[in-house]
Protein backbone atom coordinates (compact mmCIF):
# COMPACT_ATOMS: atom_id res chain seq x y z
CA UNK A 1 0.00 0.00 0.00
CA UNK A 2 1.46 3.35 -1.06
CA UNK A 3 1.68 5.83 1.82
CA UNK A 4 1.93 9.62 1.63
CA UNK A 5 3.28 12.11 4.15
CA UNK A 6 0.70 14.43 5.71
CA UNK A 7 1.99 17.95 6.34
CA UNK A 8 0.89 21.07 8.19
CA UNK A 9 0.38 24.45 6.52
CA UNK A 10 4.15 25.12 6.68
CA UNK A 11 4.92 21.82 4.94
CA UNK A 12 6.24 20.08 8.07
CA UNK A 13 5.41 16.35 8.41
CA UNK A 14 2.62 15.51 10.86
CA UNK A 15 1.76 11.91 9.94
CA UNK A 16 1.22 9.38 7.17
CA UNK A 17 -1.85 7.99 5.43
CA UNK A 18 -2.52 5.64 2.54
CA UNK A 19 -2.57 7.38 -0.85
CA UNK A 20 -5.90 5.73 -1.67
CA UNK A 21 -7.50 7.24 1.44
CA UNK A 22 -5.94 10.70 1.06
CA UNK A 23 -7.38 11.72 -2.32
CA UNK A 24 -11.11 12.32 -1.99
CA UNK A 25 -13.74 15.01 -1.49
CA UNK A 26 -11.89 16.53 1.48
CA UNK A 27 -8.19 15.84 1.02
CA UNK A 28 -5.78 16.56 3.87
CA UNK A 29 -2.66 18.55 2.97
CA UNK A 30 0.12 16.16 1.99
CA UNK A 31 3.60 16.24 0.49
CA UNK A 32 4.02 15.84 -3.26
CA UNK A 33 6.30 17.19 -5.97
CA UNK A 34 6.22 18.25 -9.60
CA UNK A 35 9.19 17.94 -11.94
CA UNK A 36 10.00 19.63 -15.24
CA UNK A 37 12.55 17.79 -17.38
CA UNK A 38 14.72 19.63 -19.90
CA UNK A 39 16.73 18.06 -22.71
CA UNK A 40 20.12 18.99 -24.16
CA UNK A 41 18.44 21.53 -26.49
CA UNK A 42 16.79 23.27 -23.54
CA UNK A 43 13.32 22.01 -24.42
CA UNK A 44 10.79 21.11 -21.73
CA UNK A 45 9.01 17.78 -21.60
CA UNK A 46 5.25 18.07 -21.14
CA UNK A 47 3.04 15.04 -20.72
CA UNK A 48 -0.65 14.32 -21.03
CA UNK A 49 -1.96 12.35 -18.09
CA UNK A 50 -3.29 8.88 -18.90
CA UNK A 51 -7.04 8.71 -19.42
CA UNK A 52 -7.39 6.19 -16.59
CA UNK A 53 -5.77 8.46 -13.99
CA UNK A 54 -8.06 9.08 -11.02
CA UNK A 55 -7.48 12.85 -11.01
CA UNK A 56 -7.23 15.15 -14.00
CA UNK A 57 -7.21 12.37 -16.62
CA UNK A 58 -6.16 13.49 -20.09
CA UNK A 59 -4.89 16.95 -19.16
CA UNK A 60 -1.45 18.23 -20.13
CA UNK A 61 0.95 18.81 -17.28
CA UNK A 62 4.61 19.08 -16.34
CA UNK A 63 6.89 16.13 -17.05
CA UNK A 64 5.77 14.10 -14.03
CA UNK A 65 4.50 14.34 -10.46
CA UNK A 66 4.51 12.11 -7.43
CA UNK A 67 4.62 11.66 -3.69
CA UNK A 68 7.70 10.82 -1.64
CA UNK A 69 7.34 7.76 0.57
CA UNK A 70 7.72 8.29 4.32
CA UNK A 71 11.46 8.68 4.99
CA UNK A 72 12.34 9.12 1.29
CA UNK A 73 14.08 12.32 0.21
CA UNK A 74 12.33 14.42 -2.38
CA UNK A 75 15.30 14.04 -4.75
CA UNK A 76 15.15 10.23 -4.47
CA UNK A 77 11.40 10.33 -5.07
CA UNK A 78 11.89 12.52 -8.15
CA UNK A 79 14.41 10.03 -9.60
CA UNK A 80 12.15 7.08 -8.78
CA UNK A 81 9.10 8.62 -10.46
CA UNK A 82 11.08 9.70 -13.55
CA UNK A 83 12.01 6.07 -14.08
CA UNK A 84 8.51 4.74 -13.27
CA UNK A 85 6.45 7.20 -15.32
CA UNK A 86 8.81 7.91 -18.19
CA UNK A 87 11.50 5.19 -18.16
CA UNK A 88 13.84 8.16 -17.92
CA UNK A 89 17.17 8.71 -16.19
CA UNK A 90 17.71 12.27 -14.98
CA UNK A 91 20.45 14.32 -13.35
CA UNK A 92 20.94 17.90 -12.10
CA UNK A 93 17.79 17.60 -9.96
CA UNK A 94 17.16 21.07 -8.54
CA UNK A 95 14.34 22.32 -6.34
CA UNK A 96 13.31 25.50 -8.17
CA UNK A 97 10.21 26.44 -6.14
CA UNK A 98 10.46 24.88 -2.66
CA UNK A 99 7.30 26.32 -1.11
CA UNK A 100 4.65 25.84 -3.80
CA UNK A 101 1.28 24.67 -2.45
CA UNK A 102 -2.13 24.46 -4.05
CA UNK A 103 -5.69 23.26 -3.55
CA UNK A 104 -7.76 22.27 -6.59
CA UNK A 105 -10.84 20.16 -7.33
CA UNK A 106 -11.20 18.20 -10.57
CA UNK A 107 -14.40 17.58 -12.54
CA UNK A 108 -15.12 14.36 -10.61
CA UNK A 109 -15.02 16.25 -7.30
CA UNK A 110 -11.71 14.87 -6.08
CA UNK A 111 -9.67 17.49 -4.27
CA UNK A 112 -5.91 17.92 -4.33
CA UNK A 113 -4.37 19.69 -1.35
CA UNK A 114 -0.62 19.51 -1.75
CA UNK A 115 2.55 21.08 -0.49
CA UNK A 116 4.29 20.48 -3.80
CA UNK A 117 7.89 21.64 -4.32
CA UNK A 118 8.66 22.11 -8.02
CA UNK A 119 11.83 20.58 -9.45
CA UNK A 120 13.79 20.94 -12.68
CA UNK A 121 15.98 18.08 -13.91
CA UNK A 122 17.91 17.17 -17.05
CA UNK A 123 17.13 14.10 -19.16
CA UNK A 124 20.12 11.80 -19.69
CA UNK A 125 18.34 8.94 -21.48
CA UNK A 126 15.54 8.47 -23.97
CA UNK A 127 11.86 8.29 -23.00
CA UNK A 128 9.86 5.11 -22.56
CA UNK A 129 6.55 6.40 -21.12
CA UNK A 130 4.44 4.12 -18.91
CA UNK A 131 0.99 4.08 -20.61
CA UNK A 132 -0.75 3.71 -17.24
CA UNK A 133 0.66 7.13 -16.31
CA UNK A 134 1.26 9.01 -19.58
CA UNK A 135 -1.00 9.21 -22.65
CA UNK A 136 1.38 11.44 -24.65
CA UNK A 137 4.71 13.19 -24.22
CA UNK A 138 6.07 16.13 -26.17
CA UNK A 139 9.19 18.32 -26.07
CA UNK A 140 8.47 22.05 -26.37
CA UNK A 141 10.03 25.41 -25.65
CA UNK A 142 9.27 27.31 -22.48
CA UNK A 143 7.73 30.17 -24.49
CA UNK A 144 5.50 27.80 -26.51
CA UNK A 145 4.27 26.18 -23.31
CA UNK A 146 3.52 29.58 -21.74
CA UNK A 147 1.56 30.61 -24.86
CA UNK A 148 -0.45 27.37 -24.77
CA UNK A 149 -1.23 27.77 -21.06
CA UNK A 150 -2.35 31.38 -21.63
CA UNK A 151 -4.54 30.38 -24.60
CA UNK A 152 -6.20 27.32 -23.02
CA UNK A 153 -5.55 27.01 -19.27
CA UNK A 154 -8.37 24.46 -18.97
CA UNK A 155 -6.30 21.96 -21.01
CA UNK A 156 -3.53 21.92 -18.37
CA UNK A 157 -3.27 20.75 -14.78
CA UNK A 158 -4.10 23.45 -12.24
CA UNK A 159 -0.73 23.05 -10.53
CA UNK A 160 1.11 23.71 -13.81
CA UNK A 161 -1.04 26.76 -14.56
CA UNK A 162 -0.37 28.13 -11.04
CA UNK A 163 3.40 27.63 -10.89
CA UNK A 164 4.61 28.06 -14.46
CA UNK A 165 4.89 31.86 -14.50
CA UNK A 166 7.19 31.69 -11.47
CA UNK A 167 9.12 28.76 -12.90
CA UNK A 168 9.69 30.00 -16.46
CA UNK A 169 12.64 32.36 -15.76
CA UNK A 170 14.32 29.67 -13.63
CA UNK A 171 14.39 27.13 -16.47
CA UNK A 172 17.03 28.94 -18.53
CA UNK A 173 19.11 29.48 -15.38
CA UNK A 174 18.96 25.74 -14.63
CA UNK A 175 20.09 24.86 -18.16
CA UNK A 176 23.12 27.16 -17.89
CA UNK A 177 24.06 25.73 -14.46
CA UNK A 178 23.81 22.15 -15.76
CA UNK A 179 26.03 23.01 -18.73
CA UNK A 180 28.58 24.69 -16.45
CA UNK A 181 28.75 21.54 -14.29
CA UNK A 182 29.58 19.30 -17.26
Swiss-Prot record:
Residue positions annotated to bind Mg(2+) are 65, 85
PANTHER family recorded:
ISOPENTENYL-DIPHOSPHATE DELTA-ISOMERASE
- Pathway participation: Isoprenoid biosynthesis; dimethylallyl diphosphate biosynthesis; dimethylallyl diphosphate from isopentenyl diphosphate: step 1/1
The entry sums up its family as follows:
Belongs to the IPP isomerase type 1 family.
InterPro entries for this protein: Idi_bact, IsopentenylPP_isomerase_typ1, NUDIX_hydrolase-like_dom_sf, NUDIX_hydrolase_dom
Primary role:
Catalyzes the 1,3-allylic rearrangement of the homoallylic substrate isopentenyl (IPP) to its highly electrophilic allylic isomer, dimethylallyl diphosphate (DMAPP).
Q: Which Pfam families match?
A: NUDIX
Tell me which cofactor or cofactors this protein depends on. Mg(2+); Mn(2+)
The catalytic activity of this protein is classed by the Enzyme Commission as: 5.3.3.2
Q: What is this protein called?
A: Isopentenyl-diphosphate Delta-isomerase
Keywords of this entry: Cytoplasm, Isomerase, Isoprene biosynthesis, Magnesium, Manganese, Metal-binding
Report the GO terms under cellular component: cytoplasm
- Read off the SUPFAM superfamilies from this record: Nudix
The molecular function terms of the Gene Ontology recorded here are:
isopentenyl-diphosphate delta-isomerase activity; metal ion binding
This protein's species is Brevibacterium linens
Residues reported in the UniProt entry to bind Mn(2+): 23, 30, 67, 112, 114
Among the GO biological process terms of this entry, one is: dimethylallyl diphosphate biosynthetic process
> Active site located where?
65, 114
Q: Where in the cell is it found?
A: Cytoplasm
Catalytic activity, as annotated: isopentenyl diphosphate = dimethylallyl diphosphate
Q: Which residues form the Nudix hydrolase domain?
A: 28-162
Q: Does the keyword Lipid biosynthesis apply?
A: no
What sections of the sequence does the record tag as coiled-coil?
none
Amino acid sequence: MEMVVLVDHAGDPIGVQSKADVHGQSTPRHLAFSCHVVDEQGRLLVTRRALKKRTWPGVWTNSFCGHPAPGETLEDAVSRRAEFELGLSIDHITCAIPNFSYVARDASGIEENEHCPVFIARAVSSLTPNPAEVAEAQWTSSSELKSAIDAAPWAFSPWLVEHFTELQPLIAEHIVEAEDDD
